[in-house]
């Protein structure tokens, strides 16, 4: 609980109160057990793929190094989805001999989701979902994984680029403190993986 609160407080600038409760018995199993297969996933690496320049460079660096990454994408609106699709298609065309692929999930929350509570009009907390999706994909590999979150070091440090981009108006998605809390969280819940920004010093 405290680790999760620290991560979300820092990411969003809000102050979170988090509680846990037992899952009802009828939801004891929330996912079907995967059938056995003789074909193991071909992926040897895992990287978030937002459709931005840094995530594209991250994918290219892996592919140029001979890796077979699983790229993980999340989108909430059409423009982002289009950019991701075009870039992924370009990568597939250029690296046609590679078996790399993409896990892509779209998710938005409509108005009135919680009665009497206004909808969130920012995307400050969006990266928590993005990281969680990447970690979910990593656990499916059945071994220790490193989720790469490519972002240039200056942006990761949350330096205000103009007078308006201060505090909660600017992203903390890849700030070293936030990513360290994610690694604390993974250790606390027993997930054999880590998140890492390969360009933290670039």
List each model region and its residues.
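Nucleotide-activated chemistry modules centered on ATP-dependent adenylation/adenylyltransferase
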Residues: 7, 11-45, 55-202
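Conserved G/P- and acidic residue-centered "switch" motifs that form tight phosphate/ATP-binding loops
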Residues: 52
């Amino acid at each position: 609980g405290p680790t999760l609160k620290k991560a979300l407080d820092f990411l969003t600038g809000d102050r979170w109160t988090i509680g846990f409760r037992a899952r009802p018995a009828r939801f004891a199993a929330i996912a079907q057990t995967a059938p056995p297969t003789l074909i193991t996933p071909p992926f040897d690496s895992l990287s978030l793929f937002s459709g931005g320049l840094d995530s594209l460079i991250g994918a290219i660096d892996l592919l140029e190094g001979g890796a077979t990454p699983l790229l993980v994408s999340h989108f909430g609106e059409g423009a982002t989805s289009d950019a991701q699709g075009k870039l992924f298609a370009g990568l597939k065309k250029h690296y046609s001999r590679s078996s790399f692929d993409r896990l892509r999930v779209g998710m938005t929350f409509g108005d009135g989701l919680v009665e009497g509570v206004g909808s969130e009009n920012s995307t400050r907390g969006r990266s928590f979902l993005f990281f969680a999706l990447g970690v979910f994909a990593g656990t499916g590999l059945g071994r220790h994984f490193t989720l790469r979150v490519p972002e240039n070091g200056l942006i990761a440090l949350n330096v205000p680029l103009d007078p308006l981009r201060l505090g909660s108006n600017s992203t903390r998605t890849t700030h070293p403190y936030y990513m360290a809390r994610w690694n604390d969280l993974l250790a606390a819940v027993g997930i054999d993986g880590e998140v890492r920004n390969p360009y933290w010093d670039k």
